[in-house]
Amino acid sequence: VFNPKDGSYSVKRGPVFSNLILADEINRAPAKVQAALLEVMQEHQVTIGGESFAMEQPFLVFATQNPIEQEGTYPLPEAQVDRFMMKVVLPYPSLDEERRILDRMAGNQALPSVNAVASPADVAQARESVNSVFADQKVRDYIVDVVRATRPGALPGVEGLIETGASPRAGIWLMHGARAHAFLSGRDYVTPHDAKTL
């Protein structure tokens, strides 16, 4: 931001400088915005005017996207899709859920107050606990085998069923998810079932 009083520039940190980012309708964003989001997701930093700013930890990005058939959407680059741990496809809401949505969003109801249930330090501590969950070499090999099985030529009969094989990053995410599943199940070790569940 230019300051006309003294001719100086200062950085104004935008909404991406948060612990939790919700990128709504990410595939409606133009390529330049998607590229900026890709940098922050990969590098955990933002570059403004040649200067880099590290993101505070923990840093998490959630995103929504519209069906690609809808007008005004852009396909997400594979490099960006690969940065997300998982994709959850949500069905339409039930009748009761849709009524509650209508009442809440189109009615005169005040939005409920939201209180923090965990601090950034709490989330960092939980991450450390999850990362300390033991994964035997056999489980790690299982995860690598699952990831490699998605690639062209890996298994007979799979050609044409998988659009793009999983990257090495998919194995990393699957290990993180399996550890989290084991942790939430009250165990300090990972089983192949934890990975299958994801």
Residue ranges of model-derived segments:
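Canonical AAA+ ATPase core
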Residues: P4-D6, E25, A29-V33, M41-A135, ...
